[in-house]
Amino acid sequence: MRAWRGETRWWWLAKRRAGFALGLAATLATGAAVVPVATAEGTGGGSRRGVAQEGTAPLEQVRVATRHYRNVDSAIDAGYVQFLGCVHEPLAGSMGIHFVNGTLAGDTTIDPVKPEALIYEVEPNGQLSLVGVEYIVFQQAWDAVHDQPPSLFDQPFMLVPSPNRYGIPAFYELHAWAWKVNPTGPFKDWNPKVLCLGTEGHRP
């Protein structure tokens, strides 16, 4: 696994983030083909003690689909790029560090096995640990072809208006904490168990 800390790593990530931003802007400017939203019923049972809530089949579906990305190098190779730093909200918790796939984020498809963002937490040893995913679709593109806001796993997406802390157009989003328990709920935005400690330089 690539070392996370170090000047060379930061320079490399800065270049990747710049490329991601340009690619996402181009996608939004040109538009993308519209694909109907996927259904999102759970496909299998079970969960892992200490990993996610027991008996939550959708989370198991997410784990199966994202197991390969527990190694962040695999996520990077698949087109996921770090977007901003460790997102933290006092008293509420954190969202961790998001790696976003610009191609997936720029379309209007919501696929439970192809999340637009992967969420990582920095461990004490400096390595990144996968803790969850986020599904993202831009409001303008979605509303142009749908009468209702998106939903997945019987959960409604939250609308994040613009302007926002991320500096991007208004979007709908849903978190799924498949790899780390969220005591406030598996689909809540903020996870008090996720920390931004020791991640100076990551916070937006």
Named regions from a protein language model:
Residues 41-204:
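Primary mode marks residue(s) on the alpha4-beta5-alpha5 output face of response regulator receiver
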Residues 21-32:
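Bacterial N-terminal signal peptides
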Residues 34-42:
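Sec-dependent signal peptide cleavage junction
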